[in-house]
Amino acid sequence: MVWCCRVLLRKYGNFVDNLRIYVKGGTGGMGLPRLGGQGGNGGDVCLLAKKGVTLKNIKDKYPHKRFIGGVGVNSSVRALKGLAGEVCQVEVPPGIVITNEHGVKIGELDKEGDEIRVARGGHGGIFKTDFLPSKGQTRVIHLDLKLISDVGLVGFPNAGKSSLLGKISHAKPQVADYAFTTVKPELGKIMYPDYKQVSVADLPGLIEGAHYNRGMGHKFLKHIERTKQLLFVVDIAGFQLSAITPCRSAFETVQLLILELQLYKEELLDKPAVLAVNKMDLPNADEKLGELLKQLENPTGNLHSLPDELVPERQIEFKHIVPVSAATGQGLEDLIGCIRKTIDEQADVQIQELAQERLQSLHKETPRTVKRNFQTSPRHKHH
């Protein structure tokens, strides 16, 4: 049985994992024929990988998504060799693949400090060109965040993520009845009858305070950025890391997971999300599930059990809430279907957005018809 969120259609546009931008190198400067002066070259457009930057930052800061290098300085009597135009440097997140409009790969930026030129500036005017400059290189490029998987499993240690991954995919992760079994991302693939494949990553379990880089905090959260959607996995019986830590209910567990993502990078909450309530084979699981669903219908009214500092500012609207048991196989087919549905919906929205962007760019590039009013000369007047 599957409970769907009341919001039937969710906007997917807030988290950005690909971006289409226009880049143009600067035009070169004019040469000076009478003195043989050389114009300055136009500025290049370069991409620089920098931690902390996201594609959403770029989209918000530069809504026009146009980046143009500076124009080269003309040659003059005072400076026969003109200065080069200013380089337009665009900061992007590490882990980016750059392709042209036809999908041909231009390059990659894997780590902070990596840099690549994506548009060359034009040459300044010299004797060989009759001292006339050339225009800079113009192109439309795509920035794609390299994804480690389509789906990332999010949950506290021992929630059953590894067991779940093993049952819904062909992965064989290490499984044991103790926390922190997973210490690095484990990848699996869900195979569908129409040969569609969806990759799923079992990521190291979070702990409270992961955003402070406790446990494997930042390593885990960094991988979460590189997934298309999130699959929250919670134990219906709740979670307790150790005998000296508080015992959290399933509802509190969901809230704490949301909080960790929010405090690390709030836009992660804009990713499409599915909630799998695991271990439904345990005693009294159905009663606890009913209570959890009521709490999720009105989360803000059920946060009194958590201290103020552990209450998230935002909530996630789960596309689907699916009760499952990795041990018995209960609900796994429903979960697999919900994952596919959410992936397909997200792809449809992205295709529509890309088509709309291309139409808008074509509209801007279409030359406008200039209307002129011609006055009839006296000799053409009819008598």
Curated annotation (Swiss-Prot):
GO terms for molecular function: GTP binding; GTPase activity; magnesium ion binding. The keyword tRNA-binding does not apply. SUPFAM superfamilies: Obg GTP-binding protein N-terminal domain (SSF82051), P-loop containing nucleoside triphosphate hydrolases (SSF52540). Keywords: GTP-binding, Nucleotide-binding, Nucleus, Ribosome biogenesis. One of its GO terms (cellular component) is mitochondrion. Residues 360-383 are annotated as: Disordered. It is found in: Nucleus, Nucleolus. InterPro entries: G_OBG (IPR031167), GTP-bd (IPR006073), GTP-bd_Obg/CgtA (IPR014100), GTP1_OBG_dom (IPR006169), GTP1_OBG_dom_sf (IPR036726), OBG_GTPase (IPR045086), P-loop_NTPase (IPR027417). Residues 149-344 form the OBG-type G domain. GTP binds at residues 155-162, 202-206, 278-281. GO terms for biological process: ribosome biogenesis. It comes from the Eukaryota. Residues 13-148 form the Obg domain. Pfam families: GTP1_OBG (PF01018), MMR_HSR1 (PF01926). Belongs to the TRAFAC class OBG-HflX-like GTPase superfamily. OBG GTPase family. May be involved in the ribosome maturation process. This is GTP-binding protein 10. It comes from Xenopus laevis (African clawed frog).
